[in-house]
Regions:
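Nucleotide and nucleotide-moiety/phosphate-recognizing core
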Residues: 2-106, 116-130, 137-142, 149, ...
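Conserved TIR/SEFIR loop-to-helix hotspot centered on a Trp-containing motif
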Residues: 109
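Active-site YXXXK catalytic motif of short-chain dehydrogenase/reductase
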Residues: 112
Length: 193
């Protein structure tokens, strides 16, 4: 079983914020597959489905971003998953421009509290990450305030497109492997840069 975890914060007030792009990506994938992420287990909302002929569990931790590792550690244990081969995490990335996407593995948290929580809880940084850029073109004072504020209408249009790209990245990772997906999606012309 592959675990595909989107990071975000529960609650309607956070639904369309930059920090919730992981949740939005999971919702997009689930919606396109005709499943609902609503089963509660291991402090997360989950749904089982098949992608690229593989059984997967889509998950959205309900522990809030900074404690995401608690839920993910329980999911990894429950499904006897190996983080280095069975876990894909979809996260927002303030260091990348809005609408860009990169796939990485074995990286530090780069200051992302949700990823820091996962690394601490799992005892490894060796897991695959789909990092979706959220840095705005406009200047923002406080990054944390921006991450938790609703996206503007123009930003939502960009997000709509990158969520499709994130879904394509997940499918390619599962079908062709991480290296092939990195080769395709980490190129500048595929990410909007």
């Amino acid at each position: 079983m592959k675990l595909i975890v989107g990071l975000g914060n529960p609650g309607i007030e956070y639904q369309f914020t930059p920090h919730n792009l992981g949740f939005l990506a999971i919702d997009r994938i689930a919606g396109n597959l005709g499943v609902e992420v609503r089963n509660r287990q291991c402090r997360a909302l989950t749904a089982r489905t098949v992608i690229a002929d593989q059984m997967v569990l889509l998950a959205k931790p309900e522990t809030f971003m900074n404690l995401s590792g608690l839920s993910v550690r329980e999911l990894v244990a429950e499904y006897e998953a190996k983080p280095e081969s069975d876990l894909i995490v979809i996260q927002d990335e303030l260091d990348f421009p809005l609408g860009t996407l990169r796939i990485h593995t074995r990286r530090s948290s780069a200051g992302h509290n949700g990823i820091e929580s996962l690394i601490g809880a799992l005892g490894t940084q060796d897991f695959l990450r789909i990092r979706i850029g959220v840095a705005p073109e406009r200047k923002v004072g406080d990054g944390q305030s921006y991450l938790l504020a609703p996206l503007r209408k123009a930003e939502l249009k960009v997000v709509d497109g990158i969520l499709d790209t994130a879904e394509d990245a997940v499918k390619m990772i599962l079908k062709d492997g991480p290296a092939a997906a990195m080769n395709r999606f980490n190129r500048k012309d595929e990410s909007g840069q």
